[in-house]
Amino acid sequence: MLFKQQVWLRQKLLVLGSLAVGSLLYLVARVGSLDRLQPICPVESRFGGAHNQAELPLRALQFKRGLLHEFRKGNSSKEQVHLHDLVQQLPKAIIIGVRKGGTRALLEMLNLHPAVVKASQEIHFFDNDENYAKGIEWYRKKMPFSYPQQITIEKSPAYFITEEVPERIYKMNSSIKLLIIVREPTTRAISDYTQVLEGKERKNKTYYKFEKLAIDPNTCEVNTKYKAVRTSIYTKHLERWLKYFPIEQFHIVDGDRLITEPLPELQLVEKFLNLPPRISQYNLYFNATRGFYCLRFNIIFNKCLAGSKGRIHPEVDPSVITKLRKFFHPFNQKFYQITGRTLNWP
């Protein structure tokens, strides 16, 4: 009798150990790095009391497991999810830009979908010669673990404006899907400036005012040599990409609308990626303190983007804003024509 109990106990410990390892591997594969997200704490349960922050990743894991099961339930009942199915896949979709257009927000929101797995950091494989020289296998090993049915997505906004990138991505996968999130060009340029300004101030360095950078003092015209201005000429960059990819492989996300009405934009992306609709209004809630939408995984696990998001922009001379919008207008019209999406920017 004692021998049977010992055997039973060893078997039970083996099963529990396997479950613990499995949970850890799945957590790494699906939840990924939380470095750019900040938990809302304390999180109150509907049953009362605040949950320990250390419990939150496990609760999120349990919720996402349920979503993954829902996504896979159309398969044969004989098919099971096994840990050995986990692989590091090359991305099937890439958010290629635009810087300060909302790339991080888009990636984190898409990660709500059970069929999406995100690369937690910007890889900078295609825009960095040193990284690119390491080869495609190095790039693949930078990807998170996922199941074959899932889509791995990475984002590196520098891809959009870097000349060599379209050809390099084409050589990897000529049928890849490309996401471009854009904002009103002048607003985006000011946001770009604001991020650089904040970095200078942290180092106690002085920096020119936006007006002096955006307007050429010699000609009083828009300074197209200023990177923040050049980046906002979306059509110039897109034309370079269209030499390698048809327009059907691009999806334009309205970054301004993603801030105010994220769900319709996310539903369009789901359709573009041929994903079943899984993201709902339940997954998104407006945080009045931060002034933008945050993510809800379940009733106790909520996340907001890091505090660096939603920076307050400096006041800019209205005449400069008018001049910039007049400058961008013809480029915007061409962008609408090429993409088939009118964004009604001023």
Curated annotation (Swiss-Prot):
Pfam families: Sulfotransfer_1. Residues 33-346 are lumenal. The chain crosses the membrane at residues 13-32. Residues 1-12 are cytoplasmic. It is an enzyme of class 2 (transferase). Keywords: Disulfide bond, Glycoprotein, Golgi apparatus, Membrane, Signal-anchor, Transferase, Transmembrane, Transmembrane helix. It comes from Mus musculus (Mouse). GO terms for cellular component: Golgi membrane. This is Heparan sulfate glucosamine 3-O-sulfotransferase 5. Substrate binds at E122, I123, H124, F125, F126, D127, N128, K155, S156, P157, A158, Y226, K227. GO terms for biological process: heparan sulfate proteoglycan biosynthetic process; negative regulation of coagulation; regulation of viral entry into host cell. It catalyses: alpha-D-glucosaminyl-[heparan sulfate](n) + 3'-phosphoadenylyl sulfate = 3-sulfo-alpha-D-glucosaminyl-[heparan sulfate](n) + adenosine 3',5'-bisphosphate + H(+). The lineage of its organism: Eukaryota, Metazoa, Chordata, Craniata, Vertebrata.
